């Protein structure tokens, strides 16, 4: 009887799969039952190399560009990775293994990790793809019931290989070219170039240049207190004829650029009566979109000071270890259109108030009671979901999290619930007080109507 080899990206994922499918016995670094052999990589095990690089060590323009006709693979230098690669190759070549399942992370890098291993093993056994959006046992079993055909993954494989090879070409040629340029007058000044690091460094450099060339300018603002029958209110002088200046962001309607001009406004208006006009407009504020990875990282940085790397690590832990969030490495802020029932069940679970959902349970219950989960293009849109959908909580509510994990889980859950509430209706009011030909603006806003939505959810 032949078996299928499942290769996950991390040992922890392999362990979760073994628990979800059941019946496995552990044999060192792999698991086995009557149907499957199950093991994992430990991240990237192989790296690209150019065969017989003829100009290694001769970094001059005469030997550029370096474009190999093909790329070879070489094991990384880490001993643990080398040992794991040997084991996986041995498992792939087992005579009783007739097929493979790629269970690496559902994304470009996960695809590349598996493809490199299979290529290095020199085997072309039939392959299927396990595509996990959540790490709960039910989600794992459901994903095994809907394995993807290998042909459907070819575009993702091509994208992954192209990215890796482009990185190599840009890095090798760019680094050698810039090093040769900076060393042309003698010496050796290695200048690394990379697809990501170089444009990122350019952003930092541009910002630093802007700071260094900034010329401070003094400006004045005139503020006034007005006495009315209902009480005292403040206004700020503005130029009613102001127009934005395209190349000078410091020009604003309330700024006066000479002290004399500011004092003349004060002298003209002090203790003088004013004529008031007022305009009010309704404004509807919907909840912010669901999180993708980038927006989650920005929110966590702004609220908690977490770095992008820290937030990703926490979200990955909530996904893999706690099974509390869906796949975090996503660039979509939308959910599939067939996800309505899953969302309803998830919100119903949060409404029970168990574990980490205790504080927000009443809000989840309000959504369920009012039937607010329904088709909505702001939330459910297949056209805006690619490989993965937005980051949302799963039906597995955690009971114990670290302080940092709890913070990330909390903002994801609140963003998830808030989007199902109706918009808040605000009334924005602009009051203009005209005194001796000078205009003073007073702005205010008040909630006209709300379903106890954004303010109360985010204050829990």
Where are these regions (language model features)?
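Long, highly charged, low-complexity internal segments
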Residues: 37, 45-79, 90, 188-312, ...
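An acidic- and aromatic-residue-enriched active-site/binding cleft used to recognize and process polar
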Residues: 9-11, 41-43, 105-111, 132-135, ...
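Catalytic phosphate-handling regions of large nucleic-acid enzymes and associated NTPases
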Residues: 3, 319-347, 376-395, 423, ...
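C-terminal or mid-to-C-terminal helical accessory/interaction module adjacent to the motor/catalytic core
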Residues: 140-219
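Intrinsically disordered, low-complexity regulatory segments
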Residues: 1-172, 372-373
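Extended, well-ordered alpha-helical scaffold/bundle regions in very large, multi-domain proteins
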Residues: 306-372
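A generic secondary-structure signal for well-formed alpha-helical elements
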Residues: 21, 25, 120-125, 148, ...
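Hydrophobic (often cysteine-bearing) scaffold residues that line and stabilize catalytic clefts
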Residues: 13, 109-113, 158, 162, ...
């Amino acid at each position: 009887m032949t078996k299928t080899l499942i290769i996950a990206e991390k040992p922890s994922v392999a362990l979760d799969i073994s628990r979800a499918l059941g019946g496995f016995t552990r044999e060192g670094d792999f698991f086995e039952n009557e149907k499957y052999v199950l093991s994992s990589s430990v991240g990237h095990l192989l790296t690209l190399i150019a065969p017989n690089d003829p100009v290694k060590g001769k970094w001059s323009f005469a030997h550029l560009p370096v474009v190999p006709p093909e790329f070879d693979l070489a094991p990384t230098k880490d001993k643990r990775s080398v040992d794991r690669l040997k084991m996986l190759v041995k498992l792939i070549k087992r005579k009783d293994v007739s097929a493979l399942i790629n269970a690496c992370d559902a994304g470009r890098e996960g695809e590349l990790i598996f493809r490199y291993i299979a290529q290095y093993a020199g085997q072309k056994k039939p392959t299927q793809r396990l595509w996990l959006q959540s790490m709960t046992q039910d989600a794992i079993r459901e994903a095994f019931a809907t394995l993807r055909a290998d042909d459907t993954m070819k575009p993702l494989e091509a994208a992954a290989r192209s990215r890796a090879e482009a990185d190599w070409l840009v890095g090798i040629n760019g680094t050698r070219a810039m090093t040769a340029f900076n060393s042309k007058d003698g010496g050796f000044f290695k200048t690394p170039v990379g697809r990501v690091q170089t444009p990122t460094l350019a952003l930092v450099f541009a910002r630093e240049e802007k700071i260094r060339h900034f010329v401070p300018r003094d400006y004045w603002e005139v503020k006034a207190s007005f006495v009315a029958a209902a009480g005292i209110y403040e206004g700020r002088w503005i130029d009613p004829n102001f127009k934005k200046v395209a190349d000078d962001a410091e020009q604003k309607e309330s700024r006066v650029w000479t002290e004399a001009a500011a004092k003349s406004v004060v002298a003209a208006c002090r203790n003088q009566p004013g004529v008031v006009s007022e305009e009010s407009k309704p404004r509807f504020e919907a909840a912010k979109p669901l999180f993708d990875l980038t927006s989650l990282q920005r929110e966590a940085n702004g609220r908690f000071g977490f770095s992008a790397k820290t937030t990703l690590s926490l979200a990955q832990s909530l996904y893999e270890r706690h099974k509390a969030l869906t796949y975090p490495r996503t660039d979509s802020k939308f959910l599939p259109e067939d996800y309505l029932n899953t969302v309803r069940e998830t919100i119903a679970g949060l409404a029970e108030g168990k574990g980490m959902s205790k504080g927000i349970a009443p809000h989840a219950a309000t959504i369920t009671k009012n039937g607010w989960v329904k088709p909505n293009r702001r939330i459910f849109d297949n056209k805006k979901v690619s490989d993965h959908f937005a980051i949302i909580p799963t039906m597995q509510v955690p009971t114990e999290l670290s302080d940092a994990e709890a913070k990330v889980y909390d903002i994801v859950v609140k963003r998830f619930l808030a989007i199902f509430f109706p918009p808040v209706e605000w009334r924005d009011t602009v009051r203009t007080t005209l005194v001796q030909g000078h205009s003073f603006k007073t702005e205010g806003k008040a909630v006209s109507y709300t379903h106890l939505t954004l303010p109360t959810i985010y204050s829990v």
